[in-house]
Amino acid sequence: QDLPIDKIYTSALRRTHQSVKGFIEKSLPWEQHAGLNEISWGNKEGKSPNTEDDLYYKNLTKTWREGNVHVQSEEGESPVEVLERQKPVVEIILSRPEEKAILIAMHGRAMRVLLTHLFNAPLHHMDNYAHQNLCLYHLQYDYTAQEFRLIKGNCVIHLGDLPESM
């Protein structure tokens, strides 16, 4: 929380707001964008995981890794749909070069989709971007070259000795 941040961008989901509450409480400029929301897992959303759901998830993510990124979760979204709703938010963010240091808070699968887009990687490579809860991806954008550079990925050192249950 000691980083100099010009703006906070979050999804519209309450859990994301809770994750960056300390920054929000500092009265930093903050925008919520539903385009940054986590992928909709459809009829699997919010259910307690069980063996059947775990198998479904593993098979679905395998399908995506094989390049079938248009496949939706049952009654939910595909990675392509997530990316399409993220693109306008990225355009907004990049249109504001005066915001030198920004914090984007979002959930795991949506973050993986976003990172593939920012690094011009194929969407089916989204699982190459590992993540843990509350991890940090530190990126730098070069407006001249119009490209992102990875400074740190999947970093959790800022969490210190937080309990596992957080």
Task: Give the ranges of each region predicted by the language model.
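Generic beta-sheet signal
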Residues: 100-108
